[in-house]
């Protein structure tokens, strides 16, 4: 049973709704979080959200998930997708299932965005579906209960 779900948002996602809306959409991070929390509450599941522009803070929060009752992680590593071995190692160390999510289709963008350090250890990857991708990841996590 998934006791708690953690949603982790990487660098620059605090700017959603304002940053390159043609790529990332007009939905704000606050809107995404509010929607996810409401859907989780309706399913009687606790959902925590965390955003940081600092890699070490993301790593610390992922490590905390090992001891705080988290049963599933939804993560949008943002640009760290293509660079952060340390965040990948933190996710692997938790031994918790996670879904990697991207608002844009990373494979239809610049070549350097085509490589993910997370996909091969994720239970699933959602890319290119905008904010709806978060809802789909949550549905998947809730179905694992």
Swiss-Prot record:
The keyword Lyase applies. The active site is at residues 24, 102. It catalyses: 3-dehydroquinate = 3-dehydroshikimate + H2O. Pathway: Metabolic intermediate biosynthesis; chorismate biosynthesis; chorismate from D-erythrose 4-phosphate and phosphoenolpyruvate: step 3/7. InterPro entries: DHquinase_II, DHquinase_II_CS, DHquinase_II_sf. Substrate binds at residues 76, 82, 89, 103-104, 113. One of its GO terms (molecular function) is 3-dehydroquinate dehydratase activity. Gene3D superfamilies: Dehydroquinase, class II. Its EC number is 4.2.1.10. It comes from the Bacteria. GO terms for biological process: amino acid biosynthetic process; aromatic amino acid family biosynthetic process; chorismate biosynthetic process; quinate catabolic process. Keywords: Amino-acid biosynthesis, Aromatic amino acid biosynthesis, Lyase. It is an enzyme of class 4 (lyase). Catalyzes a trans-dehydration via an enolate intermediate. Belongs to the type-II 3-dehydroquinase family. Homododecamer. PANTHER family: CATABOLIC 3-DEHYDROQUINASE (PTHR21272:SF3). HAMAP family: AroQ. This is 3-dehydroquinate dehydratase. It comes from Nitrosomonas eutropha (strain DSM 101675 / C91 / Nm57). The gene is aroQ.
């Amino acid at each position: 049973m998934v006791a708690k779900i953690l949603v982790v948002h990487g660098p620059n996602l605090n700017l959603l709704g304002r940053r390159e809306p043609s790529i990332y959409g007009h939905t704000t991070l606050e809107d995404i979080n509010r929607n996810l929390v409401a859907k989780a509450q309706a399913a009687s599941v606790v959902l925590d959200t965390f955003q940081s522009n600092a890699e070490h803070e993301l790593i610390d929060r992922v490590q905390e998930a090992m001891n705080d009752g988290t049963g599933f992680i939804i993560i949008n590593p943002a640009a760290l997708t293509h660079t952060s071995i340390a965040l990948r190692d933190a996710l692997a160390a938790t031994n918790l299932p996670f879904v990697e999510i991207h608002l844009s289709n990373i494979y239809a963008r610049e070549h350097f965005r085509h490589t993910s350090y997370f996909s091969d250890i994720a239970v699933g990857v959602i890319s290119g579906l905008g904010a709806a991708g978060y809802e789909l990841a949550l549905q998947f996590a809730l179905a694992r209960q």
